[in-house]
């Protein structure tokens, strides 16, 4: 391929640290914390910066998922491999998310962060959580399944529902594959359209420091550092549990499959910082599609595992749900015996699968779970409403790492992982990646395109 020398040149070029997205986002987050702490009104006024950045990302998520999934499926030789990939992915998601739920349940019972608070449920202001409870009541198994089917194709893309877009994309990819050579012009158009979408992402990501700055300034300005003190034990317990889950559980999975969790975290450090600033793992979805394919996983695997994982493989959210539910019981002196906790676990095995990777979705699922269990006071949600935003950072970070691990593992299970490329990319740490060029690095389209045809002699 004529693009190979270009890729090697790009991967060996280093840039000054102040030009790296990693450094810029760190500085932006620190400045945002300082502004929010010392000038809270100004910090709250900066909220549109964070909201605007997330909206820009959401604007292109649906078309990027569509292009990635359709191109991956339509370009496959054997359609059985798609079903195999999906089956292995769902198996992995169920096993690991169940482990996450169990770990959260065990830790909260051992540490008991809510014990001794002696909160009277009748004194809690439930008005602030009414919207979450209402949204949570809509979370049922049948409703979730029916919601995956869009009313219209346009509606799926207009609403930006990841699972609806994914479902249509899979069906479209299968249909396009059945057309054979007759459908090749459509596939070529989708490949070229994907190039445009990924280049739009390049432009949007240059605004990531501004988005992280605005979101962090608002969070600190609106809730203040003082709000962390009252319920600090729960927060510290949750953060430590998430860290241990990543290092021990995901680390063990990585070791069993021949790579290091620490190198993987280093490789996606820029995406982690973006998530830290915005509190939403969805903000890093487009770049994760890029990074995972560059890491050696085939496009068809990445296109299925990453979007699906954003609803079915939210490890951080799973830990949060069990810990928060039992914490509310402890704080309100609501007795929970082993039967109640098993019931809670079984309900969460289902309800946790409806949590999308957006800010606040975990809280809605928690409201749905408390309503479904019945034994726990729903009004107790008011206890953690003030710190939920701070806990969402740990949830989103753990979710992102969990989906990165899942993609590599599933790709290896189905024989769609280039292990040599995996090791070389992890060894480099992604430190030399200057800018995403899908036509050069991602294999978004197979074969030459007008974009890479004129750039094959350039040095990036």
Curated annotation (Swiss-Prot):
Q: Tell me the SUPFAM superfamilies matching this sequence.
A: Proton glutamate symport protein
Pfam name, any one: SDF
Gene Ontology molecular-function annotations: fumarate transmembrane transporter activity; malate:proton symporter activity; succinate transmembrane transporter activity
The record's Gene Ontology cellular component field reads: plasma membrane
UniProt superkingdom: Bacteria
Give the main localization category: membrane
Q: Which HAMAP family match?
A: C4_dicarb_transport
The protein, known as: C4-dicarboxylate transport protein
Q: State the species of origin.
A: Pseudomonas savastanoi pv. phaseolicola (strain 1448A / Race 6) (Pseudomonas syringae pv. phaseolicola (strain 1448A / Race 6))
């Amino acid at each position: 391929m004529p693009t190979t020398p270009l890729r090697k040149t790009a991967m060996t070029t280093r840039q000054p640290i102040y030009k790296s997205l990693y450094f810029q986002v760190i500085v932006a987050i620190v400045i945002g914390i300082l502004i929010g702490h010392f000038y809270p009104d100004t910090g709250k006024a900066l909220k549109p910066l964070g909201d605007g950045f997330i909206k820009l990302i959401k604007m292109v998520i649906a078309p990027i998922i569509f292009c990635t999934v359709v191109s991956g499926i339509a370009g496959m030789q054997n359609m059985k491999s798609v079903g195999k990939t999906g089956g292995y992915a769902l198996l992995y998601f169920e096993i690991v998310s169940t482990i996450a739920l169990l770990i959260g349940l065990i830790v909260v019972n051992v540490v008991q962060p809510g014990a001794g608070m002696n909160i009277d449920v009748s004194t809690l202001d439930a008005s602030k959580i009414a919207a979450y409870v209402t949204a949570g009541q809509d979370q049922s198994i049948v409703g979730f399944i029916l919601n995956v089917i869009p009313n219209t194709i346009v509606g799926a893309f207009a609403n930006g529902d990841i699972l609806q877009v994914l479902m249509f994309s899979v069906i479209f990819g299968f249909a396009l594959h059945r057309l054979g050579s007759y459908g090749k012009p459509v596939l070529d158009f989708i490949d070229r359209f994907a190039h445009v979408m990924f280049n739009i992402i390049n432009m949007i990501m240059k605004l990531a420091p501004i988005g992280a700055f605005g979101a962090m300034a608002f969070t600190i300005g609106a809730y203040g550092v003082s709000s962390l003190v009252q319920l600090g034990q729960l927060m510290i317990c949750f953060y430590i549990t998430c860290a241990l889950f990543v290092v021990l559980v995901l680390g063990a999975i990585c070791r069993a499959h021949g790579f290091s969790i620490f190198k993987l975290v280093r490789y996606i450090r820029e995406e982690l910082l973006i998530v830290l600033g915005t509190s939403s793992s969805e903000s890093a979805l487009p770049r994760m599609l890029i990074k995972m394919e560059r890491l050696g996983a085939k496009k068809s695997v990445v296109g299925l595992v990453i979007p699906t994982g954003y609803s079915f493989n939210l490890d951080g959210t799973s830990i949060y749900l069990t810990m928060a539910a039992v914490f509310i019981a402890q704080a309100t002196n609501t007795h929970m015996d082993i039967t109640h906790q098993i019931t809670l676990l079984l309900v969460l095995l289902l309800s946790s699968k409806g949590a999308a990777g957006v800010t606040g979705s975990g809280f809605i699922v928690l409201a749905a779970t408390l309503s479904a269990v019945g034994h726990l006071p729903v009004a107790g949600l008011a206890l953690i409403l003030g710190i939920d935003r701070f806990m969402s950072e740990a949830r989103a970070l753990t979710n992102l790492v969990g989906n990165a691990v899942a993609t590599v593992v599933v790709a290896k299970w189905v024989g769609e992982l280039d292990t040599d490329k995996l090791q070389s990319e992890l060894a480099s740490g992604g430190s030399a990646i200057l800018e995403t060029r899908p036509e050069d690095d991602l294999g978004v389209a197979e074969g030459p395109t007008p974009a890479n045809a004129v750039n094959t002699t350039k040095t990036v």
